[in-house]
């Protein structure tokens, strides 16, 4: 989800109820893992990638569409770059490596302006204050992570740990479960049983990665993403503002004002 206005008509959004398997886990969730791009950091972060990739493709008289974006989301940079040049048919003119180098120059100037998604701060503070161990598992490499989060250091300091895409334990990007299994291993007293972990994701490949790791997943997809990608998730919501911790046996928001902030 990309803006607060989308929350105002949430009643029009088709919310997927939790399936039998995920409902059976209600009350067993003890730890939470967050993706970052498009989930905690949103509007600008994803928009930046899209804008840069549109500029590059325009040189070849090609368009960057959502079917291509969906295939790239959540993957490691080099893996997404290969999808980009191969799916668009420009691999003979632009290598994946050259694409990344060109994209990097433009992104360096954009990332420091990244904004938080609606509901992100509220949920993270709530879980932290109630003693629920939380972490971030993002395909973003350290150099980009530092740029994207520099305005939000206080919020990210609440995380027990942060796993980035260039972590040595992450051999393969999403939809491989590597990054979520690495995250589970590093909680205090870890590894944590995947059945006790709830993951928040926006990307189809990230949802698959979490399910491949044996974890439950709440998906907060961009409204433009084809709904066929929603099917794998245990729950689909329009925004983090719509998440009810009590649905998963987590401490509920104490009052209405907390819930809406």
Where are these regions (language model features)?
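Asp-based, Mg2+/Mn2+-dependent phosphohydrolase catalytic module
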Residues: 2-29, 125, 141-261
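Active-site neighborhood of HAD-like aspartate-dependent phosphohydrolases
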Residues: 10-70
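Short, acidic loop-to-helix structural element flanking the phosphoryl-transfer center
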Residues: 19-28, 108-136, 146
């Amino acid at each position: 989800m990309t803006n607060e206005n989308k929350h105002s008509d949430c009643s029009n959004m088709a919310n997927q109820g939790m399936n039998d398997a995920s409902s059976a886990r209600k009350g067993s969730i003890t730890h939470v893992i967050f993706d970052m791009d498009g989930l905690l950091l949103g509007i600008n972060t994803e928009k930046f990638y899209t804008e840069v990739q549109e500029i590059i493709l325009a040189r070849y008289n090609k368009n960057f569409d959502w079917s291509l974006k969906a295939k790239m989301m959540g993957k490691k940079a080099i893996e997404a770059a290969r999808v980009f040049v191969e799916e668009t048919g420009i691999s003979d003119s632009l290598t994946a490596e050259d694409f990344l180098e060109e994209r990097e120059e433009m992104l360096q100037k954009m990332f420091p302006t990244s904004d938080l998604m609606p509901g992100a701060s509220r949920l993270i503070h709530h879980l932290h204050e109630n003693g629920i161990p939380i972490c971030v598992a993002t395909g973003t490499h350290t150099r980009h992570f530092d740029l994207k989060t520099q305005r939000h250091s206080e919020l990210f300091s609440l995380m027990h740990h942060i796993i980035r895409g260039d972590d040595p334990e992450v051999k393969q990007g999403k939809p491989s479960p590597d990054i979520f299994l690495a995250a589970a291993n590093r909680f205090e007293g870890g590894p944590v049983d995947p059945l006790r972990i709830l993951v928040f994701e926006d990307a189809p490949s990230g949802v698959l990665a979490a399910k491949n790791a044996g974890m439950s997943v709440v998906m907060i997809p961009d409204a433009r993403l084809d709904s066929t990608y929603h099917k794998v998730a245990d729950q689909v919501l329009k925004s983090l503002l719509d998440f009810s911790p009590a649905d998963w046996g987590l401490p509920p928001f104490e009052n209405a004002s907390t819930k809406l902030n």
